Structure formats: C-alpha cells, structure tokens
Amino acid sequence: MQITISEAAQAHFRRLLDQQEEGTNIRIFVVNPGSPNAECGVSYCPKNAVETTDHEIKYSEFSAFIDEVSFPFLEDAEIDYITEEMGSQLTLKAPNAKMRKVADDAPLIERVEYAIQTQINPQLAGHGGHITLIEITKDGKAILQFGGGCNGCSMVDVTLKDGIEKQLLAMFADELTGVKDVTEHQRGEHSYY
C-alpha cells in the first residue's frame, strides 16, 4: 500500500522535520477509523515512538509510520500542500477512513454501502444530509432512506433520480435496476430546501 504525498507536501514535511530532533519522521493516523466521525491526522514520530507493529512507508527524505489499526483505512489516501493567495494548507484525503475498502467480489450490498458512504454521502453532507441503504430487493432495487437535511427537502426527488440513481446505476450497471426512497419525509427546519 502507498499513501500519495505530493512533492509540495514532502517538502513541507522536510522543512518541519529539519527543526525536530534527528531521526524524527511523521505518523499518519485515523481516530475512530471505520466510523462516520473518523478523522485523519499527521504528527511527528520520534524514533522512540515507533512501535514494532507499525507499518513504515519510505519517502525520499523521511518515513511515514502508520499504526496497525489505521493502516487499512488509509488505503488510497493523498496528502497535498496547497499554497494560495490567502495562505497555505495541508490537505489529507482518505476516502476509506470512514469505511474500509471492500473487495471487488464482495456481496453487492457491501459494495453499494461502500459507494454510498465514500462517494454519495460526502456530497450530501454539504446540505447536512445523508442516505442509508436499507436493503437490495430481489429485482435489484436499492432501497434507501434519507436523513438529516435531505428529509423533507423539496429537491429530494431530483437528488434521488438525477443524482443518486444515475451514479449507482453507472457503478453497478449489471447488478442494480433502480433506487427507491422509503423515507417518511417530514418538512421542518432541518430540511435543506
């Protein structure tokens, strides 16, 4: 497994590490891995903080250490250092932090759930919403329930048909036939539109 650290981010880490005790590297970790409130982080990793169970990924001028629990949740992670007019910031994208990547041959319900958690729900989160996969019917329909800002939103039908259904049918073309909303929508202050 490799974690992609851009050249700019590697240079940033090198500058920071130059100010630390010799032999200090970085640690990449996930707090609450596999949960909706998973958060990724980077910290200094002095020599004496390296555990025998840690995974080491070597870069040109330093190593990144990852603890055994965080390791599978950091698959496909990317770290970048972006400089803009307003300043600079380190970005860490870890698409599998909230849910471990599933195998291509995993049951359909697991693969659809993974797609929802890693691709669809992050898009809905901007409106305070999310969807939950209830089941997949024998005829291939994904039964979904909307929550948060999506519950009671007047745009939910458009989101369902033009967004979620199109995306899921494209990803699971030969396996899914459609999606169905089983939410009892109640319009309220929580609703986005």
Curated annotation (Swiss-Prot):
GO molecular function: 4 iron, 4 sulfur cluster binding; iron ion binding
Alphabetically ordered keywords of this record: 4Fe-4S, Iron, Iron-sulfur, Metal-binding
Cofactor comment text: Binds 1 [4Fe-4S] cluster per subunit. The cluster is presumably bound at the interface of two monomers.
Keyword Cell membrane: no
Family named by the database record: Belongs to the NfuA family.
Gene name as annotated: nfuA
Protein name: Fe/S biogenesis protein NfuA
Top-level lineage group: Bacteria
One Pfam match: NifU
Cofactors (names): [4Fe-4S] cluster
InterPro entries reported in the protein's UniProt record: Fe/S_biogenesis_protein_NfuA, FeS_biogenesis, FSCA_dom_sf, HesB-like_dom_sf, NIF_FeS_clus_asmbl_NifU_C
NCBIfam families (UniProt xref): PRK11190.1, YhgI_GntY
Binding partners and assembly: Homodimer.
